[in-house]
């Protein structure tokens, strides 16, 4: 019976790997009834599992392309929807800045595609006195999910696998190949997906073509997406909103009369003074508009967003006759645009703003006087850059972001299924990747309501204004990688050995350009009438003025070499890096598995700017894990690992405050992870509970070196990015899947339940004694504790299925938002990350699919089925001090409400 037992195990694992690969390797035999079967052969493509790279699988999640389709993943926010402890970092303008894991985020969570690091979150300091908190995008390019074969999410230090950036975790994507589209036993394949998401009116259309002729094969995927902003719950935007707008009214003063010279026949003062006009002054008028059209800090709805994405992936190759050797190429081009308007900026002037600006500017010649019946022409005040701006026009603030990724490369792959040579698998690849983030800020004051992004000042629109500011950040990599795998036995011990090597030449470049303003003036002068001396503005002696056509003035704001935000000198950092890693996962019979890995990284950076903190860094990372199997139904697991993050390019450039800063030595950030788990497994499925402890040290923040002078602490040198903090967190993670037919065989086959839970607790936060003007580390990046419970059914033949998910989130812990700031005088003050925190919430989602004749699959989902109104911490976190583009002066938090009941539909076709 032993042979039949092994056969049942193989079939069961195959079905579960298709349904939920994250748990596939833990499921044991026993779900089928005992019966004698004929010998058959089952061929299946190998699915990536949690324990492929690390023996314990602790902190790992794996999602395949099939999983992404079943979970209806259409964007970055859908990817981790049901995975507690992993959250998307909102960039504040529609894009994202990577992920947050275990209290860290952005550049402290590695993001790679086929081993290629994606662009860093680069936050440049903003202009003083402006509405922005960052001068650059701060985003990280998003991945096209229709190109993804599998994604592995690792929670906890993981630099032995992913290198720099995997301080708190990593997210690693693997790109599809032709085999993922070509069906078994076929020479070609076509896949198409059409999907609609109601939460953002998103439309996705993707088509994949693959073919094989002899040894030649190719894959082509094109994906297009369009979407808007994520719409808040309908209750959040109900009603109308009112605001004050400055409108012209006649001046009540008896000395406010005037005559315009060009409006008098023959330009004769005496013939016109009997019909003078009166100056205008500003008065607030209360106006009411829909919540969608309202502008100001009390806006109920999110800023409007227009999102578009176009992606091409082409992967040709040739497989030699013996199937062991493959040579191929890859070409990828993805462009995403995020165009948004910041509607928290009031479109219209108010009397308070008008008077304050006029007072600051002093007396403005011609204020109150206008030509013809155009009374708005007499209302203008002081604006930016010395320009005069009129109350006639509305202000619009727009951010246009374009993320462009280009990649092309070559690869050689050796696969030996017989495992009878020096390597079972070898891959040599070379990739050139360039990613650019073009962030264009535009401020217009030249259209009636501020909604026209394309309006510009002109001579016929006096007191109109426009400002442009563009920051383009790019990174390029030329990466050579080699990977080798070999399985072998020694003394009845099974070894799975892998070796990875890499060499990279990289460049980082930030360009500040198109930084200028335009404004339209008008010709104005006060005249003395020939026969009336010194008119005083009363009705009998009105002022005699000339109001003529205007002209457009353009002024450059860009400067060079002044070390402030207005410095448009290009920033360039380049260098090289290499790594070598070895890992061996050992099976010690049926009782234990042991694994260990070691990795060495070297990076050297250079810059023509002597103030850039370049240098050489050498780091050593390692991990070790063990799985004890005292019984068939029980695994005891434990792993330790380290992580590091090298200084980012923004940190190396430093903080510039007008003086020539000195380069400083910045060490890598370090982390140490300990994790222990227990796994129960059997016919019923599996259940895993784990405890983790993550310690972070040498965290990099902006501040000063401290020194003691005359018995008092004071700052030393210039502000810079320094190693200054350490922190420690602990937590628990639970996940599992229950097969109800395995629990009780009288229940129909196909019913299952899933469960996931994550909680993080802050244990310690410290600051180095030789640092000052430092903000203590605020853990706004921690996702509140969350439970996710699911109940589903998959028809055994895979024809149809339905799934319900309950998500419950606890409130954000206030203690994670409280901290202190060390002041320059040696004292400190209490600080708070943000003024608000989220309350507990829960939602119910239902989704299902139906397959027609194996070629067509209809999928549908109803999210927030009960139409519950709630706010996620990820949204509110955009108001926190650690946000990339912090939302300031928020009056109403309705705009952060999550969507109400919404629907997603998709049609998939596979041939």
From Swiss-Prot:
Domain called TBDR plug: residue spans: 51-176
Keywords assigned: Cell outer membrane, Membrane, Receptor, Signal, TonB box, Transmembrane, Transmembrane beta strand, Transport, Virulence
Gene Ontology cellular-component terms listed: cell outer membrane
InterPro entries the record matches: Plug_dom, Plug_dom_sf, TonB-dep_rcpt-like, TonB-dep_rcpt_b-brl, TonB_box_CS, TonB_Hb/transfer/lactofer_rcpt, TonB_lacto/transferrin_rcpt, TonB_rcpt_b-brl_sf
Main subcellular location: membrane
Motif (TonB box): 38-45
Similarity remark: Belongs to the TonB-dependent receptor family.
Subunit structure of this chain's protein: Binds both human apo- and holo-transferrin (TF), via the TF C-terminus. Forms a large complex with TF and TbpB.
UniProt-recorded name of the protein: Transferrin-binding protein A
Protein source organism: Neisseria meningitidis serogroup B
Taxonomic path: Bacteria, Pseudomonadati, Pseudomonadota, Betaproteobacteria, Neisseriales
